[in-house]
């Protein structure tokens, strides 16, 4: 029986293969249909669809989330409550520059690319992952709180202390989160790492407000 880590590695490998296949097909279709142009609202950061010929699928990561009920009434710490969604996202790069993300999900038992986009998120995320990640980024988790429209990068320390978080642009905007400058090391302050307690109240309020809007 595979361990949870081995299962994630197998899942990641299968999802990566699907992302690569899907992107190759996407590039062929876009060049065939729109060569020499760029359709309005194109999901990736290129100036011409021909640029896609030089783009590739880079690394991927699973998407985690926290149940809104656990945010409103915490039963544990933020990290412990995070669970995988079953969705993977893969960074797409061109000339070593992020141009967007591919979203991959398992549908009827088969991994498939379901969407492209997130050009701004890809740049924000890649910069933070390079700054905070170890060699294989195994110390990082991407956590999306759907009901607060907020994304966080969890950064686990190597010494077993409580993980800290880098709020991504969506979280910085939605929660009016300021970069940490009074706590942690100089490197932490520069990278914008905060404790979960520093955004818990704002996150709870955002989730509560958004859930109320759907009633």
Which residues does each PLM region occupy?
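Intrinsically disordered, low-complexity regions
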Residues: 13, 37, 42, 159-161, ...
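A short, surface-exposed interaction/processing loop segment used at functional sites
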Residues: 98-146, 162-215
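Short, non-transmembrane alpha-helical segments in secretory-pathway proteins
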Residues: 2-75, 117-139
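Phenylalanine-focused residue identity feature
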Residues: 23-26, 42, 61, 78, ...
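Exposed beta-strand-loop-beta-strand "reactive/processing" segments of non-cytosolic proteins
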Residues: 44-107, 151-158
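Generic signature of intrinsically disordered, low-complexity segments enriched in small/polar residues
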Residues: 26-29, 45, 62-67, 93, ...
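Glutamate identity and glutamate-enriched acidic tracts
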Residues: 2, 6-11, 25, 40, ...
